[in-house]
């Protein structure tokens, strides 16, 4: 760049800073680039499929799928993982269907969970915005977009037509809260339902509710489906689940993860680790027996998973080996740096 252009750019930057404040425009090379902080989903395979070890903080995420596919279970699992790391979480229950007992079984600390059951869609989104702007909440779940009913529709007659009202509401709300979410470094997850488009001859007839705004504003979109049943004898004890990363602005999209959701227990993490361990050579399988680092840990997947549940230090070691191998070096380095920082903060607090 020649001297005249440099002077003109410096003058423009100076004027922008005086008018809009310091940091309104900056060079990307002025600061060290850091990996995007993430919150685990509770599924190791899904964390790896997302590419950064979980769902990104400071972003909007959409999770959609058919009924009884595990949407709410997945979000409650995210809350449980976030609470383990000391995060503050909120659940905006527009469907008025949250079961505290079930949430507790999945590992959620229901005593510390903030819950709102709003009357209208406007109220739900306003509460979400206020929680984000407080800078004190780390994870917010909105369940669900389909239940965000505009006030005009609630106060109107049953047969009244309200064309595009919900889509306009979502578009306006997302324009307003997106910037606040980034500044607060808060993860906001919208659960959505599926509808069928009429008269579609080619391609998928499926679409999500609430218009197109959420599709654009979401950094990550997850399509969750139930693919089969988990049985113990003749009794169905859970469901086989597949999650596809349909959109991903923070890593490569279109990856898939498959795991089991056990009724009353949630995501079957130990069983998932056994499967991934065998696939990537950390766990040896000989006939029905499984061995880890030369030691037999169980006959059959269920017994091997029980061994991991009874020996959390072995489970933690296997999980670390899988994450180190399957996640990018930048993500691992950033997680180690944050762990070191937390240790230093704890030591500083102890000194005080």
Curated annotation (Swiss-Prot):
UniProt xrefs under CDD domains: RecA
Family (UniProt): Belongs to the RecA family.
PANTHER family: MITOCHONDRIAL DNA REPAIR PROTEIN RECA HOMOLOG-RELATED, RECA
A biological process term (GO) from this entry: DNA repair
Predominant location category: cytoplasm
Record-listed ATP binding positions: 65-72
Record function comment: Can catalyze the hydrolysis of ATP in the presence of single-stranded DNA, the ATP-dependent uptake of single-stranded DNA by duplex DNA, and the ATP-dependent hybridization of homologous single-stranded DNAs. It interacts with LexA causing its activation and leading to its autocatalytic cleavage.
Subcellular location: Cytoplasm
Gene3D superfamilies reported in the protein's UniProt record: P-loop containing nucleotide triphosphate hydrolases (3.40.50.300)
Any single GO CC term annotated in Swiss-Prot or TrEMBL for this entry: cytosol
Keyword Iron: no
SUPFAM superfamilies, per database record: P-loop containing nucleoside triphosphate hydrolases, RecA protein, C-terminal domain
Protein name per UniProt: Protein RecA
SMART domains per the UniProt record, alphabetical: AAA
Keywords: ATP-binding, Cytoplasm, DNA damage, DNA recombination, DNA repair, DNA-binding, Nucleotide-binding, SOS response
